Structure formats: C-alpha cells, structure tokens
Design a protein with these regions (language model features):
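Short, low-complexity N-terminal intrinsically disordered segments enriched in polar/charged residues
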Residues: 16-55, 59, 63
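A solvent-exposed, acidic/Ser-Thr-rich amphipathic alpha-helical stretch
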Residues: 54-105
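Short, solvent-exposed coil/turn segments at beta-strand boundaries
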Residues: 57, 64, 105-108, 134-142
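Short, cysteine-centered beta-strand-loop-beta hairpins and adjacent loop/turn segments enriched
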Residues: 90-94, 117-127
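A short hydrophobic beta-strand element
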Residues: 107-115
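Short beta-strand edge/turn micro-motifs at domain boundaries
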Residues: 129-154
C-alpha cells in the first residue's frame, strides 16, 4: 500500500511540474512582449514627439495604422498618419511631453502625458494633459486613440 501511495504521489508531482514550467515560460514571454511594447511607446514619445523625428514613423507604425481620433478628411494608413502628425506637431515652436503614467496589458499600452507647448502662431505657451491608447502587433503600432486636446483650444 505504501509503495502504491508513493508511486501515485511521484506521478502526481512529476505530472504537475511541466505544466507549471510551461505556465512560467508563457508568463515570461507575455511579460517580455509587454515590456517591448512599453519600450516602443516610450521611444515614440522621445524620438518622434519630443525630437520631432518624423523619419522614424515608418519604424514605429504599421502601414495600415488606424487613427481612431482622425480629423475629418484625414487619410488613414501610415502616410495619412505621418502627414497629420507632422502638421500637428509643426504647430509648436517648442514642445515637451512628459509621460506621467504607462499601463500595458497584452497588445495594448495606455499612457497619460503632460504637454507643454508654445504655439508657433501666437507664441502662447499652453500646458495640458492627454491620454493615448495604442494597440501593437508584431512590434508596430496598428491603432491609436487619443483624448484631452481641449487645452489647445482647437
């Protein structure tokens, strides 16, 4: 009887261990993807927004990027997005964006930022908070939502 019980426990313990290891590997892989997605968004703000390096748009955004906050008449896709971002950020002679919060889950990253901008048209400095939501697939941003632009008076 003791031998049977020992054999049963041995099988039970060994049968559970690989599943736990698989769960740990899956969890580690998911965490790695989430961290890569967060790093992508941080880089977008540093390089594309703060430094106005628009040549990197092709490296960050999918060809079929869908801007859920597109202005009327804005073309969807990378070229339309590139034009809209270039024109929008071109309104500011000075620009500083600071990420206050970043949360990521799966293929989604959400951010809250503080913007300090100086308008090219009237040299007026404005400060406000916005929120952005991104969906990322295969290392490229496929969808973007944004809220909070009221502080610009547009």
């Amino acid at each position: 009887m003791k031998l049977l019980l020992a054999a049963f426990l041995f099988i039970l313990v060994n049968a559970c261990t690989p599943k736990q290891e698989q769960t740990n590997r899956t969890s580690a892989a998911a965490t790695s993807i989430i961290e890569k997605n967060k790093e992508l968004i941080k880089t977008v703000y540093i390089e594309m927004v703060n430094k106005k390096n628009f040549t990197l748009i092709d490296s960050f955004f999918a060809p079929n990027i869908f801007d859920h906050g597109a202005l009327e008449g804005q073309q969807q896709g990378r070229e339309g997005f590139k034009k809209a971002v270039t024109e929008f950020l071109g309104m500011f002679s000075q620009l500083e964006v600071k990420q206050e919060v970043m949360i990521a889950e799966g293929d989604n990253v959400a951010t809250r930022e503080t913007w300090k901008v100086t308008m090219t048209s009237n040299n007026k400095t404005l400060t406000g908070e916005t929120m952005h939501f991104f969906r990322i697939k295969d290392g490229l941003i496929t969808d973007e939502w944004s809220k909070g632009w009221e502080f610009l008076g547009l």
